[in-house]
Amino acid sequence: MQTTKALLISPALIRSCTRGLIRPVSASLLSRPEAPSKQPSCSSSPLQVARREFQTSVISRDIDTAAKFIGAGAATVGVAGSGAGIGTVFGSLIIGYARNPSLKQQLFSYAILGFALSEAMGLFCLMVAFLILFAM
């Protein structure tokens, strides 16, 4: 007889205990604490409602800062690629001019175009690094 009584849980108790589990995180964080109601408390029941909140500690902030610096460092690696691209473009200009000096003007215009595209990619990588550092 005792086990039958333990298995019967009132529907009001189930509703009050599972209400916190069903709500999304934003509703749990933004809602005001509710006034105590006449519904039974779920502290004595086996169902425990987990309270979800954002907690920031010194350690988690340090991890976030380290992640920012690592991401910014990884983004600035592209600037080295830009430098290598510019060197390749002007090296090819010198080789092309040595092979056929009559194409000087056309080779130079292509070299300037290659320089601009390579420099733009380097500046884009630098911009992403600054965004990671200061905008996030």
Swiss-Prot record:
CDD domains: ATP-synt_Fo_c_ATP5G3. It comes from the Eukaryota. The chain crosses the membrane at residues 77-97, 112-132. Trimethylated by ATPSCKMT at Lys-104. Methylation is required for proper incorporation of the C subunit into the ATP synthase complex and mitochondrial respiration. It catalyses: H(+)(in) = H(+)(out). The modification N6,N6,N6-trimethyllysine is found at residue 104. Homooctamer; the c-ring consists of eight c subunits forming a circle, and each subunit adopts a hairpin shape. Component of the ATP synthase complex composed at least of ATP5F1A/subunit alpha, ATP5F1B/subunit beta, ATP5MC1/subunit c (homooctomer), MT-ATP6/subunit a, MT-ATP8/subunit 8, ATP5ME/subunit e, ATP5MF/subunit f, ATP5MG/subunit g, ATP5MK/subunit k, ATP5MJ/subunit j, ATP5F1C/subunit gamma, ATP5F1D/subunit delta, ATP5F1E/subunit epsilon, ATP5PF/subunit F6, ATP5PB/subunit b, ATP5PD/subunit d, ATP5PO/subunit OSCP. There are three genes which encode the mitochondrial ATP synthase proteolipid and they specify precursors with different import sequences but identical mature proteins. Belongs to the ATPase C chain family. This is ATP synthase F(0) complex subunit C1, mitochondrial. It comes from Mus musculus.
